[in-house]
Amino acid sequence: MTKNIHKHRILILDFGSQYTQLLARRVREIGVYCELWAWDVTEAQIREFNPSGIILSGSPESTIENGSPRAPDYVFTAGVPVLGVCYGMQTMAIQLGGKVESSNQREFGYAQVEIKADSALIRDIKDAINPAGEAVLDVWMSHGDKVAEIPADFVTVASTDTCPFAIMANEEKRFYGVQFHPEVTHTKQGLRLLERFVLGICGCEALWTSATIIEDAIVRLREQIGDDHVILGLSGGVDSSVTAMLLHRAIGKRLTCVFVDNGLLRLNEADQVLEMFGDKFGLNIVHVAAEDRFLSALTGVDEPEAKRKIIGRVFVELFDEEACKQEQVKWLAQGTIYPDVIESAASATGKAHVIKSHHNVGGLPKEMKLGLVEPLKELFKDEVRKIGLELGLPYDMLYRHPFPGPGLGVRVLGEVKKEYCDLLRRADAIFIEELHKADLYNKVSQAFTVFLPVRSVGVMGDGRKYDWVVSLRAVETVDFMTAHWAHLPYDFLGRVSNRIINEVNGISRVVYDISGKPPATIEWE
């Protein structure tokens, strides 16, 4: 019998911080299931979820503004431990009788927190001892307001020079507030502090591991699907690949994967997908060779959004055609992951807690009436990759750089033609190969080549050539919301340029994109 991996669970109430999903990922990393809901949940919803503990997130808002978000009152009467982080600490203080004020000295960045009193939250956790003999924590602050007065039944656990209440606690009720962000890596002992709260104070067991997630998913898939057949659109990307492997382990040959080769994939990618999933893992794959259909639909179209829509529409049409041939199929599987669920959820305040399906494949014929199977919908991307490794998928495939859904359709600028795609595929393969050789591939977050539909004069031997231009793009980023261009070595860039111009007949010039995000986007289209 499988363990109930959802037995202990943490509820994180989201007040809008950029770090909230990171907070949830840290709790999962500790080995405990958690969910992320908007701050405006009802008492009934919290009771139904039955959390072992509650965490109140940070927020870009100010607790002293009229109408700023507050935690439901039930949070403080539910009888479970509560941890307030930054804004979460401030709203806890206000709601329990304390005071918050705007600070003249805002704290953004590193700070040293001095421990003033013992607390279960940080006992034996420290980075150093200061000259006064106090334990010190190196933390990451990001706040303008600060708690000016803690609630009557709380004690001051830690402070900084400018923030008198950096940690507050009510040990009896197991309520804790920290003015810093324990979820970011800059707070050196942050994970230990969260671990102490989740495992020690809330009493959760670390049941949430890659192996137990797989075991649980297989049991649930078998219960949901029974003896029915399932269809899945397999792209070779991380989410659909892990979905395919999980379903294959659960129901074997009753899974049919439809792989649509749109002619917009990377060099040899179609062969690699078919070889890995068909030959190596023995999945049942329907290969749809559709390059002509996609390129024909894209003829004369040069506007990026129009190209995206056409590629999406043609994919859905092809998938529908194949799905209709599979008469025994009763279920459609999708690689929806937890951030998709969070994004597509909405509440009265425009924040997320109402869980709705996020459709990766839309527009299926109404007469098909397929049920939906989403085995990854509770998982973050890093968790999906880890269970992919556990299921036997290769590291290089799971951890390769992101590739856009429309593929080369948005990396060939302007109108998409077969000639352009073929040139781009070969140039991009050289760039990626050289990054691996130089041990630079995993040091950048994303790298790729873009085809520019302009010709440039070049010289080869005694002759002149008038051929196409490609741009290399490599960026470094944490969250893909902002990015810096990667400062790759000049000799490396020179080597890549020489190889592309010499080995790819039809390209006469290679340039390197040194634009950050913002103002530029990572992809060119």
Swiss-Prot record:
What residues make up the catalytic site? 86 (nucleophile), 181, 183
What organism does the UniProt record list as the source? Yersinia pestis
From the Swiss-Prot or TrEMBL record, give the protein name: GMP synthase [glutamine-hydrolyzing]
Q: Write the Enzyme Commission number(s) for this entry.
A: 6.3.5.2
| UniProt: ATP binding residues | 235-241
User: EC top class, in one word?
Assistant: ligase
Q: What gene name is given for the protein in this entry?
A: guaA
Q: How does it assemble?
A: Homodimer.
A single GO molecular function, which one?
Answer: ATP binding
Q: Which reaction does it catalyse?
A: XMP + L-glutamine + ATP + H2O = GMP + L-glutamate + AMP + diphosphate + 2 H(+)
Upper lineage is:
Bacteria, Pseudomonadati, Pseudomonadota, Gammaproteobacteria, Enterobacterales
Looking up HAMAP family in the UniProt record yields: GMP_synthase
Pathway(s) annotated for this protein in UniProt: Purine metabolism; GMP biosynthesis; GMP from XMP (L-Gln route): step 1/1
Where is the Glutamine amidotransferase type-1 domain positioned along the sequence? 9-207
Query: What GO CC terms are in its UniProt record?
Result: cytosol
InterPro entries listed in its UniProt record: Class_I_gatase-like, GATASE, GMP_synth_C, GMP_synth_GATase, GMP_synthase, GMPS_ATP_PPase_dom, NAD/GMP_synthase, Rossmann-like_a/b/a_fold
Q: Name one Pfam family in it.
A: GATase
GO BP annotations, alphabetical order: GMP biosynthetic process
